[in-house]
Swiss-Prot record:
InterPro entries reported in the protein's UniProt record: DNA-dir_RNA_pol_30-40kDasu_CS, DNA-dir_RNA_pol_insert, DNA-dir_RNA_pol_RpoA/D/Rpb3, RBP11-like, RNAP_Rpo3/Rpb3/RPAC1, RNApol_insert_sf, Rpo3/RPB3_RNA_Pol_subunit
Gene from which the chain derives: rpo3
Pfam family, one: RNA_pol_L
GO cellular component entries: cytoplasm; DNA-directed RNA polymerase complex
PANTHER family per the UniProt record, alphabetical: DNA-DIRECTED RNA POLYMERASE, DNA-DIRECTED RNA POLYMERASE II SUBUNIT RPB3
Task of the protein: DNA-dependent RNA polymerase (RNAP) catalyzes the transcription of DNA into RNA using the four ribonucleoside triphosphates as substrates.
GO MF term set: DNA binding; DNA-directed RNA polymerase activity; protein dimerization activity
Species for this entry: Pyrococcus furiosus (strain ATCC 43587 / DSM 3638 / JCM 8422 / Vc1)
Assigned keywords, A-Z: Cytoplasm, DNA-directed RNA polymerase, Nucleotidyltransferase, Transcription, Transferase
EC category: transferase
Name of the protein in question: DNA-directed RNA polymerase subunit Rpo3
S-adenosyl-L-methionine is among the record's keywords: no
Similarity comment text for this entry: Belongs to the archaeal Rpo3/eukaryotic RPB3 RNA polymerase subunit family.
Superkingdom classification of source: Archaea
Amino acid sequence: MAGIEVQILEKKEDSIKFVLKGVHVSFANALRRTILGEVPTFAVDEVEFYENDSALFDEIIAHRLAMIPLTTPVDRFELDALELDDYTVTLSLEAEGPGIVYSGDLKSDDPDVKPVNPNIPIVKLAEGQRLVFNAYAKLGRGKDHAKWQPGFVYYKYYTIVHISKSIPEWKELKKLAKKRGLPVEETEEEVLVTTIKPFYIPKDFEEYEGKEIWEEIVPNTYIFTVETNGELPVEEIVSIALKILMRKADRFISELQKLTS
């Protein structure tokens, strides 16, 4: 992966935005698809009900349980491996109404695998209603079901908006770009705005678009935004995805060499 550059633009607890330089669009899309479909997390896969007097069918409750994000310990599992660890965690519940059953009421037999948010409502129980079940969580991948997706990811082309100083009110656009927190450079003839965030041209300037105002796409450079559901730290999601990509490439090269030898 020589020649690749990464510049972090913004880092929050649940998201990261970075510039990826020196790669073809096919690699950028492969990274996006790997994050969504290949990075494994824990999620409820099966539920065994013993009692359910609630207003919801077993299937509906099971679906709600499956979509609750569960913490996934990075240090205990080889998440970048191409074969997943066959490990099951049991989350049990025994509740009686009246009241609302929340994700925090689930009791896990593994303290490292538990609901990310304890305040997700599952079902409301009326007086005398009971809900008893065991939910079994295992590692899986988003390509098999969305419940295993670690988060959300998208990318856009890295572009530079050129604004000619022949426009009478060009300073207004420069001021607007700075207000948006966008990098602004200036030459004798034009203003250059790097769109690390959206930059919308006001209607008053639409007549200049395409000539005095035009957008340059910087080759092989993309702005990624990755958000986590909470199962994994956001930087780990990107790191694991890159390792999986490299492992897949190594396996492909190995199989190709077998065919040509």
